[in-house]
Every structure is written in C-alpha cells, then in structure tokens.
From Swiss-Prot:
PANTHER family reported for this sequence: D-AMINOACYL-TRNA DEACYLASE 1 (PTHR10472:SF5), D-TYROSYL-TRNA TYR DEACYLASE (PTHR10472)
Record protein name field: D-aminoacyl-tRNA deacylase
Gene name as annotated: dtd
GO annotation (BP), single: D-amino acid catabolic process
Gene3D superfamilies documented for this protein: D-tyrosyl-tRNA(Tyr) deacylase
Species classification: Bacteria, Bacillati, Actinomycetota, Actinomycetes, Mycobacteriales
Molecular function as annotated in GO: D-tyrosyl-tRNA(Tyr) deacylase activity; Gly-tRNA(Ala) deacylase activity; Ser(Gly)-tRNA(Ala) hydrolase activity; tRNA binding
Length: 143
C-alpha cells in the first residue's frame, strides 16, 4: 500500500463538475492519494492511517493528530504504475477495483476512528483534484 501525502492549505476533489470532498483548514491539512496493491488488506490500511495521522510534517513539527488537521483521501491506482519498459505504464501491480475499494474505505475509516475529520473522493470515478500545497511538503508512505 502506498500513500502520497501532501501538506496543504486547501484541497478539493470534484466529479462531473461537482465538489464531492473538500478541506479548507484554519491552518494546514493533508491530501492523501492512496494506492492499493494485491497483498494489501484492512490491517495494512489501519497501520498506514495511524502512521500518517502521527507523521510530524506540519508546522512546528506537529502531526495531524496534534492539531486536528483535516484530511482529504483520494484513491490513486496510478501510484503503482510500472514504467520500466517502453513508454506506456503498466498497471498490473495495482489491485483491481473490487479489491482496492474496500481497502481505501478502510483507510479512511481508520483515520476517522483515530479522530480525524476525513473527506473523500469517489472510488473509480474520473476526478479533478485541486490543491494548494504548503511548503511544498510531499511524502511517500509505503507498507
């Protein structure tokens, strides 16, 4: 499982021109782009959610848990692109939608159980993500 975490001052995700999830924190928040591979499960999702929630990448070495920073979760199968051969990425390392969708939901649910305010995109939809990256700070987490 991979989560590309970006520290943001705002982020929103739209489907068909309609905003389906948005965060506009008073300070900082996190955008989490979540990729799932074949051997991932809800337990890994919970472990990665805990790691991200406690990750000290906000101002003054604070974590989202420390300040109650909101989180926007967006599924992102392209995090498992294989570009070693040719010019066209291969997606065989990404879990199929039927496997990945409940794991992405488990990740968001685990964050909520930790106390996070979570907004989310729509799994499998063509989404437009708008964000204002702060820093910029972008970190790849992987289990």
């Amino acid at each position: 499982m991979r989560v590309l975490v970006q520290r943001v001052v705002s982020a929103a995700v739209s489907v068909d021109g309609e905003v389906v999830g948005a965060i506009r924190p008073d300070g900082q928040g996190l955008l989490a782009l979540v990729g799932v591979t074949h051997d991932d499960d809800a337990e890994k999702a919970a472990q990665l959610a805990e790691k991200m929630w406690q990750l000290r990448i906000l101002d003054d070495e604070k974590s989202a848990a420390d300040v109650g920073a909101p989180i926007l979760v967006v599924s992102q199968f392209t995090l498992y692109a294989n570009t070693k051969k040719g010019r066209r990425p291969a997606w065989n390392a990404a879990a199929p939608g039927g496997v990945a969708e409940p794991i992405v939901h488990a990740f968001a649910d685990a964050l909520r159980k930790l106390g996070a305010r979570v907004e989310a995109g729509v799994f499998g939809a063509h989404m437009r993500v708008e964000l204002v990256n702060d820093g910029p700070v972008t970190v790849l987490l992987e289990l």
